[in-house]
Amino acid sequence: SFRGEQIIVCYGHDYQTLLAQAMAELNPSICRLQMLRARPAINLNLQHALLTGLSCVHYGAFADLPEAAAVQAQILRDAPHLHEHGIHLLISPTPHGDLIIGDSHDYGRDASPFNAEQVDDWMIELAEQTLGCKIQVVERWQGVYGSRGPGPFSFLRVAPGLSAALMHTGVGMSVGPAMAERNIAALWGPA
């Protein structure tokens, strides 16, 4: 057991174990995404991340622009399976010449432990078309994060001395430290 003046439970994506009843009121879901590490058949000397129009309609900063509507319409017309599986191509180089390729988005209450091979095949096909060369996949994995709550994050006071902090988007690593600072200040005041 744990004892403390204040305890903050930081969830990650597990909304069904600790404080499940309090979490159920938020009606949260999770997102499971598939990722690949691949080697290109030729030296691409790629120095920066590569995004496509698929990414532009996935991220709100771009998707909310009026110009994105035409891109979204083309995707829905020509490749509805990409929209259905939340596939948007991101390619990031590693220092060793490999490429990190992703990703897909599968939303629900539970994350299947099994990847969909067809989703990987579509991402490989998109990457090869975009890069203009074949790639060899050397690793596959999935990520899971909390998603689609009542806002981008929640901070609940579950009981006296017990709080819960949850992210509902895939930006936890980016904004997590600021969220922690804000939540601690809410409990004890600014530093």
Q: What is each residue range found by the language model?
A:
Residues 2-63, 133:
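Central helical "cap/lid" subdomain
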Residues 85-88, 92-100, 106-191:
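C-terminal catalytic lobe of FAD-dependent flavoproteins
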Residues 28-30, 81-85, 147:
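A short catalytic or substrate-binding loop motif that flags glycine-/basic-rich loops and adjacent residues
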Residues 16-20, 69-75, 134-137:
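Short Pro/Gly-enriched beta-strand edge/turn motifs at strand-loop
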Residues 43-67, 140-162:
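A broadly tuned preference for mixed-charge, low-complexity surface segments
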Residues 61-87, 91-93:
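Oxyanion-binding "anion nests"
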Residues 22, 29-30, 35-39, 62-66, ...:
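Short, surface-exposed, polar/charged, turn-prone segments marking secondary-structure boundaries
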Residues 45-54, 79, 86-99:
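Conserved FAD-binding catalytic core of PHBH/FMO-like flavoproteins
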